[in-house]
């Protein structure tokens, strides 16, 4: 099932509300349009020219985001194995990263729109609008680097596993925060330094610089996740660490496995007591 097309009213000009802007971003099929809408919506929110707004029966968040015709989306198990060496390997790495960032755009703006009904401080939306804007800029950065290498997003197949995390947590804000920033983005903190080192060793300083920007921003995204997870847990009178572990066991479809970048995670507020008890434990492991 594909996302319904956004209306012209939703995509032309400034959004009527933050929720309307978030919905239009998720529904847009063209990645460049997602980036444009994310920029304009984030700017309007920062300038305090948008109300929060609300979803309605007729205008709810879609079950699936808008997507271009390419790349072909495959189940993760059907993805072809690719060499990590040479120019083709770097293009494959960047293409995979572009796909991750496009999903991050949709997952973040879906969080903003879907959970606007929650009684949260305005600073909560300030943080996640900022994250949504940065995810869009990450996609744009990686796309430009792919173009410099003679490639583009859509040239290779991609897997459809990431959006499943959004679908699995659409019922719960605290579950969404547990899985997306505190599992998926935290994993980026684990793997990015080695990828940056590998690109530098291959002489691809430009691609390494792109990953460096993303890595630094991911630290902030995980920090936002840790802050708001604690806020929600403590508001409900629950201890954050065991609650996190329970939510991951219920809602995440894979193992939590080392190696971990413990220092970066801790700097972002995600201390080992959250994730070490989950090592090699997954919903279907």
Language-model features, listed with the residues they occupy:
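Non-heme di-metal
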Residues: 2-285
């Amino acid at each position: 099932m594909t996302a319904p097309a956004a209306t012209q009213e939703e995509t032309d000009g400034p959004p009527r509300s933050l929720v309307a802007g978030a919905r239009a971003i998720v529904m847009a099929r063209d990645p460049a349009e997602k980036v444009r809408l994310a920029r304009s919506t984030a700017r309007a929110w920062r300038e305090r020219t948008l109300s929060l707004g609300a979803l309605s029966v007729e205008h709810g968040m879609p079950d699936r985001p808008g997507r271009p015709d390419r790349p072909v989306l495959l189940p993760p198990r059907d993805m072809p194995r690719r060499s990590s060496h040479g120019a083709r390997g770097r293009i494959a790495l960047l293409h995979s990263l572009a796909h991750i960032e496009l999903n991050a755009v949709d997952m973040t703006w879906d969080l903003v729109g879907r959970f606007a009904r929650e009684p949260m401080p305005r600073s909560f939306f300030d943080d996640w609008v900022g994250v949504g804007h940065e995810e869009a800029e990450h996609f744009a950065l990686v796309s430009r680097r792919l173009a410099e290498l003679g490639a583009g997003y859509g040239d290779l197949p991609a897997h459809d596993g990431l959006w499943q995390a959004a679908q699995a947590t659409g019922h719960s804000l605290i579950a969404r925060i547990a899985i997306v920033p505190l599992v998926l983005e935290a994993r980026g903190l684990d793997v990015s330094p080695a990828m940056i080192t590998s690109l530098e060793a291959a002489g691809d300083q430009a691609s390494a610089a792109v990953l460096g920007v993303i890595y630094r921003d991911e630290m902030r995204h995980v920090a936002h996740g840790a802050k708001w997870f604690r806020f929600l847990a403590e508001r409900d009178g629950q201890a954050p660490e065991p609650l996190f572990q329970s939510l991951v066991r219920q809602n995440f479809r894979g193992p939590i496995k080392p190696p971990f970048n413990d220092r970066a995670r801790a700097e972002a507020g995600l201390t080992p007591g959250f994730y070490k008890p989950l090592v090699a434990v997954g919903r279907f492991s």
